[in-house]
Amino acid sequence: MPDKTSYIFSNARIATLGENAEGLGLIDNAVLAVKDGKIAYVGPENALPAEYASFEKIDCENRLITPGLVDCHTHLVHAGNRAHEFELRLNGATYEEVARAGGGIVSSVKNLRAASEDDLVRETLPRLDALIAEGVTTVEVKSGYGLDRDSEIKSLKAARRLGEERDVTVRTTFLGAHALPPEMNGDKAAYIDRVINDMLPAIAAENLADAVDGFCEGIAFLPDEIARVFDAAKAHNIPVKLHADQLSNLHGAALAASYDALSADHLEYTDADGATAMAKAGTVAVLLPGAYYFIRETQKPPVELFRAAGTKMALATDNNPGTSPLTSLLLTMNMGATLFRMTVDECIAGVTREAARALGLLDQTGTLEIGKDADLAIWDVERPAELVYRIGFNPLWKRVFKGQI
């Protein structure tokens, strides 16, 4: 394979995922030209511009090319694991009971605060490598296990370093409003003050966050508390995202939409008004079947409402130590189909085009269109449905990141 960024993939089936394409935008007998790390042409081989005819050709032998996969919701940077809580839940404890007893997110805080930045990078890289091995070229990574200024900064710096250690685009999200740390003794107002006046200004000053997130739930923060964080984020010109309506309907989806959020995530209890508000605002619904499966939820996100409203839907692993220790977007797609009844096209778009949209990156990646980064996944499959259908099997042939094979 050429160690350069200008060449042609020939003899391929290509799923462009273009905005105006029908379905997945499939093109048979297609070629994709890469020039200087960007997509220069994608389409029928017989229409290839003459200027690319001399480029070295790589025969795909009729394999399928899709955009590189995008995991748009992860908590990839964390220390330790919570296998003991998994056992507790197997014995009957609920997520809420574990959290209120001092477990859950707060139990990860102790581990992260004790870890160095180097420790965090070292522990996270194997999880990132698992995603990369399945064709992921872009990953979002949240903080939220530090819950104080220095630890949140440490988390975000570790996340940024992942993109230096591996050929992958990393988008960082500040999730200070994730849980109330034990030292606050239940004083949520004072903690939100700390998020707004201490953590966020320091993080913004170092340009460490591409977005600001919050956990809007009875066991975390209420809508008025999240609104304070979002107002502060907007003052720093940082876009927002929201963990919303996972365990109850606090109208988090509508709250996110009112701030033109990039995405609202989980959404098991979102109602029709929330779905409509998201569609109007262009806020992507990021569905997380790994968490639904792992904590044995019974309330499914309202996929039919999202379809009816025209709300864009993405899928993500939600990789985290407590409720979704999942490092496979291929399995996530299968779960989206089997658990949430999403279609094959919705699942594949959900980990490419719509996931890129949820990160504000659709102008750069997520579809195979001229001028975008040559982020590609090439699969040894006959039809796209195989990517969603198989369980525990990885048919990736080649992964391309910004033109580099």
Curated annotation (Swiss-Prot):
Q: How is the cofactor bound?
A: Binds 1 zinc or iron ion per subunit.
Signal peptide span:
none
One GO MF term on file is: iron ion binding
Q: Where in the cell is it found?
A: Cytoplasm
- Keyword Cytoplasm belongs to the record: yes
**Where, in this chain's numbering, is N-formimidoyl-L-glutamate bound?**
145, 320, 322
Instruction: Give the CC-aspect GO terms.
Output: cytoplasm
Residues at which Fe(3+) binds: 73, 75, 243, 318
Q: Which residues bind 4-imidazolone-5-propanoate?
A: 82, 145, 178, 246, 323
**Cofactor list:** Zn(2+); Fe(3+)
Q: Matching InterPro entries, A to Z?
A: Amidohydro-rel, HutI, Metal-dep_hydrolase_composite, Metal_Hydrolase
Looking at the record's lineage, which domain of life comes first? Answer: Bacteria
| GO biological processes | L-histidine catabolic process to glutamate and formamide; L-histidine catabolic process to glutamate and formate
The EC number of this protein is 3.5.2.7
**CDD domains from the xrefs?**
Imidazolone-5PH (cd01296)
Q: Which PANTHER family match?
A: IMIDAZOLONEPROPIONASE (PTHR42752), IMIDAZOLONEPROPIONASE-RELATED (PTHR42752:SF1)
**General function of this protein:** Catalyzes the hydrolytic cleavage of the carbon-nitrogen bond in imidazolone-5-propanoate to yield N-formimidoyl-L-glutamate. It is the third step in the universal histidine degradation pathway.
- Stored HAMAP family: HutI
Which NCBIfam families does the record cross-reference, listed alphabetically?
Answer: hutI
What family, per the record?
Answer: Belongs to the metallo-dependent hydrolases superfamily. HutI family.
Protein name (Swiss-Prot/TrEMBL): Imidazolonepropionase
